Amino acid sequence: MAATKLHPALRNAIRAGANLPTEVISATFDVQEGIKLLSAFLLRHEPVCVLTGAGISTDSGIPDYRSPGRPPHRPLQHLEFLGSHERQQRYWARSLYGYPRIRDTMPNVGHQAINELQRRGLVGAIITQNVDGLHQRAGSQHVIDLHGRLDQVKCMNCHSITTRDELQSRLLADNKALLDQFSVVHDEAVRPDGDAVLDEDLYGRFTVAACASCGGVLKPNVVFFGGSLDPEDVKRASTAVSEASALFVVGTSLATWSAFRIVRQAVEEAKPVCVLNSGPTRADGVIPEYLRLCMPIGEVLPAALRQL
């Protein structure tokens, strides 16, 4: 899409305080107008704090949980994983297959646009609900991984952190006899957390690796459902919102409280909010005034960047 750059006079007027609309813009609204409004929002409120969700990574081939047509999924619970060796076998067997898909995924134009906006000083901190590390891979700094990192593994006993690649090598070595028996139920079954649906007969024969330092239970360094966020990450996210001029939400329905409370904080602190998401969000009808762009992220973000 060709996008006309903002006229320098308009850019200066926006930076000087020209009013921006605070209305919901539907998916049927002119995309070019939405691009101009987003460009104006970013200029007017630099630096903005960015909050991202699964929708920013779908163009990289990582599916989300809530898009239309996605099969229903019961997420693994934190206590369920810790309390059952069978659940640990099931998780790590599926992750052994699914993790490389996430590890080898590349950032898309949305990640790259946010990185460039940060490089230009229009974006400050980036808070992400994603565990894929794609913001960092795109070159972004000051990224707060609110739900952890899939490329890390944590011991639940000694709390040491090791790399997921190191564990992958151990799992492959310990389960060499099973590898040729891996049968994926359907190819689209790899999920945002690196989980994959495999033949049920494998799980009971899968060897789970223990912590190399203390023999404790290993868990991916991500927040399972029912688990608690790292208090330091919560504090850093709150500080990032407070220090920013505005909040820019990208690719999330805000269904989880951990994400929605960040928006609530921005509203309580009278920060302008812009939401760019291809579908409805929890903020719809709740936040009284904000810029809502119900438009494709991979189309709108790069086009807005080209206008600046």
Curated annotation (Swiss-Prot):
Q: Cellular location of this protein?
A: Mitochondrion matrix
Cofactor(s) the protein requires to work: Zn(2+)
- The entry's active site is 147 (proton acceptor)
Keyword Nucleotide-binding in record = no
Report the EC code(s) recorded for this entry: 2.3.1.286
Question: Pfam families from the xrefs?
Answer: SIR2
Q: Which GO terms describe its cellular component?
A: mitochondrial matrix
Q: Does the keyword NAD apply?
A: yes
- Alphabetized UniProt keyword annotations: Metal-binding, Mitochondrion, NAD, Transferase, Transit peptide, Zinc
Where is it mostly found? Answer: mitochondrion
Q: Report the co-factor binding details.
A: Binds 1 zinc ion per subunit.
GO MF annotations, alphabetized: histone deacetylase activity, NAD-dependent; NAD+ binding; zinc ion binding
Annotated residues for binding of Zn(2+): 155, 158, 211, 214
| Listed SUPFAM superfamilies | DHS-like NAD/FAD-binding domain
**Chain's role:** NAD-dependent protein deacylase. Catalyzes the NAD-dependent hydrolysis of acyl groups from lysine residues.
Q: What is this protein called?
A: NAD-dependent protein deacylase SIR4
Native organism is: Monosiga brevicollis (Choanoflagellate)
